[in-house]
Amino acid sequence: MEPLSLTVYDRNIWHLFKKEEGAPQAMFPTNIKYIFEDDDDVADVDDLVFQQQQPDSELENVIIVEIDGAGQLENVELISDQYEMLSYRRERPVSLASQRSLSWLTSGNDTGGDAGKKSGDISDPAAGPDVPREAPLSIELELVSEFKDYRNLNLEDLKLDELTRIFCIQNKQLQMISDALN
């Protein structure tokens, strides 16, 4: 099974009003369980809960990622009461061999005893054997969480064009959710 990287972004406009460092809207799902089409050992959703969690705990959000036998992304589905999926996209980063080549180019010290070596040659002993491998499949999901009550915010401080932009973003999200339901 090829490694998988899953990143979830909450595109709720509420994050535009928060003044936090970093990216509070980015989430990295945990409690991941691989289920294969021919698995008979997963009887129900309760089997997906980590043993370290409380036995009576419930899963809140389930992301189903369908990948074919060749490792190609077929579909992503979200089951949640708190989030609606806006979109997903597959990202395949540069292969590991290419990453080594790029790092050799950027850190290149071409003036050593390797005068015959071309820039970007990855036969460098420190780089290890040049075995071309694919980088992990990377999937990014864009979700929107429940809309918040904005009455507590001081919206009078915002300019009209900023309020219009926020209104347009939220309308676009609502339209995407509506289209997905049809």
UniProtKB/Swiss-Prot annotation:
Gene3D superfamilies tied to this protein: 2.60.270.60
Region (Disordered): 105-134
Main location: cytoplasm
Localisation: Cytoplasm, Cytoskeleton; Preautophagosomal structure
Segments crossing the lipid bilayer: none
Family matches, as InterPro entries: Atg31
One GO cellular component term: microtubule
The keyword Lyase is assigned to this record: no
Keywords recorded for this protein, A-Z: Autophagy, Chromosome partition, Cytoplasm, Cytoskeleton, Karyogamy, Microtubule, Protein transport, Transport
A Pfam family that the UniProt record links to this protein: ATG31
Top-level lineage group: Eukaryota
Record flagged with keyword Zinc: no
GO BP terms in the entry: autophagy of mitochondrion; chromosome segregation; karyogamy; piecemeal microautophagy of the nucleus; protein transport
Physiological role: Plays a role in starvation-induced autophagy. Involved in mitophagy. Functions with ATG17 and ATG29 at the preautophagosomal structure (PAS) in order to form normal autophagosomes under starvation conditions. May be involved in microtubule function, such as chromosome segregation and karyogamy.
Protein name: Autophagy-related protein 31
Organism of derivation: Candida glabrata (strain ATCC 2001 / BCRC 20586 / JCM 3761 / NBRC 0622 / NRRL Y-65 / CBS 138) (Yeast)
Higher taxonomy: Eukaryota, Fungi, Dikarya, Ascomycota, Saccharomycotina
Record gene name: CIS1
